[in-house]
Amino acid sequence: MNKFIICLCLFAFIHSINMDAAIKHLVSHAHTSSTGYCAAYVADALVAGGFKFTRQASAYMYRTNGILKGIGYREISKPSSFKKGDITVTDRNSAHPHGHMAMWSGSKWISDFVQRSEFVYRSNQPPVHYFRYG
């Protein structure tokens, strides 16, 4: 009986995710330039899509604390093409102590603003990690 309930709960969790709703939220709240709150904007979008997780203080923590993996994302090598809902987490460095986080809308990278590419730092570029849902 308990196994049945656990399976039912996992089924409900998996099927309650709406990536289109997450992206719609992200697109509708994006600014033209950075506000400095990339992780909060991407986290808000994930919540709008039905994801449940503990918010982190910094973007890099969504990778290092296993938050993205805990909600069904897996780390991947840089793909030849991106899929809607892919996430990048850029490591922190001395110039950017919180790192950076963004989501692929299907046509562009968006965090708290609409980006030109997945790379947001002009110099001293730390490693970028790629995550895909499912």
Residue locations for each model-derived region?
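Sec-dependent N-terminal signal peptides
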Residues: 4-13
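Alpha-helical structural motif
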Residues: 6, 18, 86-88
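N-terminal capping segments
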Residues: 12-59, 98
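Non-catalytic ligand/cofactor/substrate-binding and regulatory segments of enzyme domains
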Residues: 17-29, 74, 84, 122-134
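Intrinsically disordered, low-complexity segments enriched in small/polar residues
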Residues: 39, 49, 58-60, 71, ...
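...with weaker cross-activation on analogous glycine-rich loops/strands in unrelated enzymes
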Residues: 54-123
